């Protein structure tokens, strides 16, 4: 994933995390999901069309669709009020695919930092599956906090370092990202509930009834 695209992935993860925390309305988060989702679909399509059949280029571009489709789906759900069950099950597909991309980063690319980043994305998208696909609504604040944290440590910061020419992969960056990222996952539930808006942690009776229908 190129540095420019990754930078805006960081932005949309932060915005969507704040949405899950109840700090931004779904409609307020929609435009950026359309922008970044469109970017993450158009960019790999152009790369593949210009690849001349280069397998490495095609493989690198293929993972972008996982995120592009996710953000476009979020945007469409937000403006149509469709339920998130389908997106939740797609998130399980993304989580499993991310494990494969992580393995490829560790082995074929000798890039442990992005190997860890892909692992953290797998965890986040699996949490989205639990939240949306299986309906574990109580996880909403936890998923929101992890999305914000990963937006910073797996996307925005690495992307800024990449585009500024200061990015270095290796065991040390991988270890730093892993420690911060997995600590965020472990602490997600209590911190998420502390950061969430009252309407998320203590929904009114009408909202509770809506989630159980």
Curated annotation (Swiss-Prot):
GO cellular component, one term: plasma membrane
Keywords: Cell membrane, Membrane, Transmembrane, Transmembrane helix, Transport
Parts of the chain that traverse the membrane: 4-20, 32-48, 56-72, 116-132, 146-162, 172-188
Superkingdom assignment: Bacteria
Disulphide bridges: none
Topology of this chain in the membrane: Multi-pass membrane protein
Cellular location(s): Cell membrane
Signal peptide positions on this chain: none
InterPro entries xrefs: AmiSUreI_transpt, AmiSUreI_transpt_sf
Family, as annotated: Belongs to the AmiS/UreI family.
Function: Possible transporter that might be responsible for the adsorption of amidase substrates or release of their hydrolysis products.
Name of the protein in its database record: Putative amidate substrates transporter protein
Organism: Mycolicibacterium smegmatis (Mycobacterium smegmatis)
